[in-house]
């Protein structure tokens, strides 16, 4: 289709006789994301590109493109747009550009793109590296790399008829033309690359410079071998120079990789500069080849004195440059140069406190290190040991050149003794002739000493130590056993059972026959009844004796019990002793030793005082402290039942008990409150107050308290007299009967209720709901409050099975001995066709009682608050309800 359009346009041109000039941009502006061609405003301008794959075949897969032209300052700026990314801009030198004249809408697409003077050249060009002379693939990145060039060949100045191969399928829509891989064949030197094939825009490039990785000289064969890369294969293109002097006698012994220079000999030590140039491309930095000094022997000096070191060998002096003097190092120390010939050198070595063995020696001429064919190294004087002794746990060694703590090491070994390293010892600093160290525990008496300084071991020395013991436990106060480790035994003879004498005892107690392990012998010895710390004893084994000390085990408490009457604490444990004068007992830091009632080694009885609080118990026996304190929890104490005037509400009444430790978790001390020998319900509780709810309806309550099975305070509570706060209108439901809801406080379910109308008395049956919900308590002093409502009153629901015809009557109520009588209004209620009637929750018309209001005596604590709350509600006095939060009942 596109070809037909082009032919049609050409045909129109020929018919009209119109001839269009080729596009001649005066400039091009471009970067990696856009390009603009600039034309004179009165001349033809470009409209689009037709990129070709080759000389004759356009790119059919190419997305549409166009130039968006506009006049800017009298010039026509044509910005190129394409529906595919710029990384896909590629085409041959035969690509076409379409042109339009300013005065004609006809588009002419016959012009060669190569005819454009200005167009985007390669931009932001980068190479992954330069190619080796042996040839390799190189990655080239940049913009417009294949615009008007290639695409799969890159023309070069080495041979324009043999372009480099560009890898990749350019017709693949995913192929990135800004990132191409080019195969460079083997070659050398500098050349030019032509990315657009016009020949007008050469880009200089070259093969990689020669690289020298190593060099080896063979003086016997007078050959120097140079290893590296990029030496190419043609000797005529290569130049080799040593210290600026060309070397004609060389061959390329391995293509690209190795050059061998023949007939070269040098007697002086030091560096030599090597330069290689391949096809006018030189090595980037001259390589330094070293002719090393050769060391065959070296003398030794004392490490703590200055000394002259003599080195023998070859190339130890420069005959060509007398000012070239070496730097000499022995280990990490400098040996100051004195003089030298080609075969012998002298230098001065300062004192070296660390010394050393087999230290490396280096004679460096101008940066070139020496070599030694027989591995010559330097060693300071060898240490010697002449004698050794043991006294009071300290070993002393006598010798020479013993070095310092940092460079020396000591190891002990022997029959029956595992190898033991001594990490802490002291060498005399003035003459290095003595060493002292603390002898560690050894199983056997005789041992060998291995002394090493800087890796040099002195002659082995043998020493014997005297008997020693180590106590490893603390015996109990009674029937105690002392475990003793034995060191420095005579392992060559059979030992009899040792004995122990404690304190001022006149008799010794036999111990067990020592048993052995890899580190020591062990025996067990009995100890007499006793307490305290640092007790002296004498240990005897065969003919040797040694003195030491031990401490008895500290007191410990395992558990506690409380006496049946609750008056005493019994602490059970160990090592309490039997003397009250030697024991101290502290509770919460206070001394309670005076309250000790009984004392035995395993039990301690203490009287309980009201002032005691839960806390840590600390016991000392004869100056011996407990390892860990015992936390003492005390049983609950009930002080009294605190209801004021021994009163409580009749309906769901609360009973308040005061005391301490009321929250104990011990089942044996659980606090329980009973009313008329019946269990009560816990309403609220903390360490000092317990509030329970009584569920009975009896007129008086005999309240008893218990701590576990032990009884506590008891009393008899009576109910405050009932009080009515609200009498609603009586509902008279036809066919259902009479319903009356009465609200108040301290109602009982022992009552008689009736409604008198005219001369007829209608008996009423009543149901009672107590007011106090199980998560509320009345209070008048808390900031977290809500107003009291009818939900906080007792609710009495009374009804009959028959209705009445009257509109008024007298309601009679009798609670035990307290009676109430009210004139009431009776309201007839008609039932709906589909009734769903239950206990009414909505307030009906109500009336406040005008007479018969009776209030019993108020009670203390919560009971009193309830009575006060009832009064407050009746007289509309502000009152609050406090919520219990976080309590578990």
Curated annotation (Swiss-Prot):
Residues 120-207, 293-380 form the IPT/TIG domain. Induction: Induced at the loose aggregate stage and expressed through the remainder of development. Glycans are attached at residues 68, 169, 179, 275, 321, 406, 421, 426, 450, 517, 559, 578, 588, 618, 646, 679, 752, 787, 806, 816, 823, 836. It holds the Pfam family Ig_TgrO1. Residues 20-851 are extracellular. Gene3D superfamilies: Immunoglobulins. Disulfide bonds: none annotated. Its main location: membrane. It is a single-pass type I membrane protein. The chain crosses the membrane at residues 852-872. It is found in: Cell membrane; Cell junction. It comes from the Eukaryota. One of its GO terms (biological process) is cell-cell recognition. tgrB1 and tgrC1 are involved in kin discrimination. They play an essential role in aggregation and subsequent development. Could function as a non-diffusible cell-cell signaling molecule that is required for multicellular development. Has both cell-autonomous and non-cell-autonomous functions. Terminal node, epistatic both to comC and tgrD1. Activates tgrD1. This is Tiger protein C1. It comes from Dictyostelium discoideum.
